[in-house]
Design a protein with these regions (language model features):
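Extracellular, beta-strand-rich glycan-interacting domains
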Residues: 470
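N-terminal secretory signal peptides that target proteins for export/translocation
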Residues: 1-13
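Formylglycine-dependent sulfatase
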Residues: 13, 29-454, 459-461, 473-493, ...
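Short hydrophobic beta-strand that contains or immediately precedes a catalytic carboxylate
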Residues: 465-466
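Hydrophobic h-region of N-terminal signal peptides that target proteins for export
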Residues: 20-29
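Sec-dependent N-terminal signal peptides
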Residues: 14-20
Length: 518
């Protein structure tokens, strides 16, 4: 054989072997990566956790926490990095979830509004490379259980082709077809449906399940089965990424049809002044009696979360699993004299739980990191070693280095978080929303909360400004005080810089320049 022939064949073997070796290398790397379990009940405020008043956490938040019972979260907190200042920038279910999944703000994520059948402009489309896409491509088995609520409902019922999944109430619920699932290969989910003891779900193949069981417990049971792989739900040779989206403590919270009776009994006989303890709570509001059911739902969610933690221990996966407990947004629950539980810049609405445990890697502590919704995806990808696979269009920041080492200088700590409120814009002849109205923008720093609201003709309507350090319950709007004009201008300038960076309409359409204080 000539040398040229020999080297030619050697080159051919190399060309064949290289991709094979690459596959083996990728598989080996994936097997070494940690599992991820991400649990996020809806509408649970940061103050609705018992441990804030316990030794080691007292004084970490500068206002009174709720008198709730959360024994599992309490134990988990002692093993976790607990953020005191995580923010839901657009504190509504769908916009937050859009940011969570894509790492982008609502103006870019495709989900600027709460998803329903009148808002085709707000939906998690197949285009953006999402968190689960990256995880799946990196060799993860990906599972989604529970509430999704990021898609525009269409007439795509698997059981009744050409019909909505809820023909009597077609506005909200949605079925997610397989091609829209962004890498999730295990599926037990629905859009949004607020009958907590009468939930329904669609599985991988579009089969509908109606378990007639309080939804967080049902979801936790299936999360446990997925973790233990009882029915071959996942590929055991791969690390797994599991998201569990629980609906409670989201409303309704009016009766025992909304929560577990055993949890309600913990609060049933307590007077309102022992439950609504925050200094900005109005116990005369009609909603006040709901607090017992809301707290009962929080305690029930805690029990469901405990089931998931127990399964990880049983499976011996505690040490190699990153576990997050957080929420979409908060709940005002009679604070600020508003019936709207969310969508406002108040701390009860924006400030959400964010607890993350990664044994042997993250030192348990509290941290005041101003984490924003779009930061979660890149940060979590960073923690599993996928820094280089964060999509280039991601607007959030990878803060994984700060979770691993709070003194790290790899990335600058954020000094502010945006507040975003969008509303329906123009509608077509069929009543479908064709654009959104950017009703308010604001900024939250470690000391101040500011929000600027506009009218439909793009004039300044109102400015809110709170000194959260000296007025933690945000009882006094100090925006009209002449001595605070300079402060408002400074905060507005900082907000404008961020809005320009993310190409928000308040920057691109010149709205902020028009309504800012001169």
């Amino acid at each position: 054989m000539s040398n040229s022939s020999f080297f030619s064949k050697l080159s051919m073997l190399k060309n064949v072997a290289t991709p094979i070796l690459s596959v083996f290398a990728t598989t080996a790397a994936a097997q070494q990566r940690p599992n991820v379990v991400y649990v996020f009940p809806d509408q649970m405020r940061n103050y609705a956790m018992e441990f804030w008043s316990q030794p080691g956490f007292e004084g970490s938040v500068n206002s009174q926490n709720d008198p709730v019972h959360t024994p599992n979260i309490n134990r988990f907190a002692r093993e976790s990095v607990v953020l005191t200042s995580a923010q839901s920038n657009c504190p509504l279910s769908s916009p937050h979830r859009g940011s969570l999944l894509t790492g982008m703000y609502p103006n870019k994520s495709g989900v600027p509004l709460n998803c329903n059948s009148s808002r085709p402009i707000s939906s998690w489309l197949t285009d953006p490379v999402s968190w689960s896409d990256v995880m799946s491509q990196a060799g993860y088995d990906c599972g989604y259980i529970g509430k999704l609520h990021v898609q525009f409902p269409t007439k795509n019922s698997p059981q009744n082709p050409g019909e909505y999944v809820e023909t009597q109430r077609p506005v909200w619920d949605a079925y997610t077809e397989p091609q829209q699932r962004h890498g999730f290969n295990y599926w037990l989910s629905y859009g949004t449906f607020d009958e907590h003891k009468n939930p329904h779900y669609w599985d991988n193949n579009g089969n509908r399940h109606d378990p007639h069981e309080w939804s967080p417990i049902y979801e936790a049971k299936h999360a446990v089965s997925y973790i233990l792989n009882r029915n071959g739900e996942r590929d055991s040779s791969k690390p797994f990424f599991l998201m569990v989206g629980m609906n409670p403590p989201h409303s309704p919270y009016r009766s025992l049809t909304d929560c577990m009776e055993e949890d309600y009994n913990l609060y049933a006989k307590q007077p309102l002044d022992q439950l609504l303890v925050r200094k900005n709570a109005n116990r005369e509001m009609r909603k006040a009696e709901s607090v017992r059911y809301y707290f009962a739902s929080v305690t029930g969610v805690d029990r469901a979360f405990g089931m998931i933690l127990d399964a990880l221990r049983e499976a011996g996966l505690d040490d190699n699993t990153i576990v997050v407990f957080t929420s979409d947004h908060g709940e005002t629950m009679c604070s600020q004299n508003t019936d709207d539980p969310k969508n406002s810049p108040y701390s009860e609405s924006m400030n959400v739980p964010f607890l993350i445990r990664y044994k042997g890697h993250l030192t348990p502590r509290t941290d005041n990191l101003l984490l924003s919704s779009p930061d979660i995806m890149p940060t979590m990808l960073g923690l599993v070693g996928l820094h280089d696979q964060i999509p280039s269009v991601t607007q959030g920041v990878d803060y994984s280095s700060l979770f691993l080492d709070p003194t790290s200088k790899t990335v600058e700590r954020p000094d502010a978080a945006l507040y975003i409120q969008n509303m329906d814009g123009d509608k077509d002849k069929d009543g479908l929303v064709v654009n959104y109205f950017p009703a308010a923008r604001g900024l939250k720093t470690h000391r101040y909360t500011m929000a600027i609201y506009i009218t439909r003709d793009y004039k300044r309507k109102e400015i809110l400004l709170f000194d959260d350090q000296n007025d933690p319950y945000q009882l006094n709007n100090i925006a009209d005080k002449p001595e605070n004009r300079k402060l408002i201008k400074q905060l507005t300038k900082r907000m404008g810089k961020i809005l320009k960076e993310i190409e928000d309409p308040w920057a691109t359409e010149g709205i902020l320049a028009k309504v800012a204080l001169k």
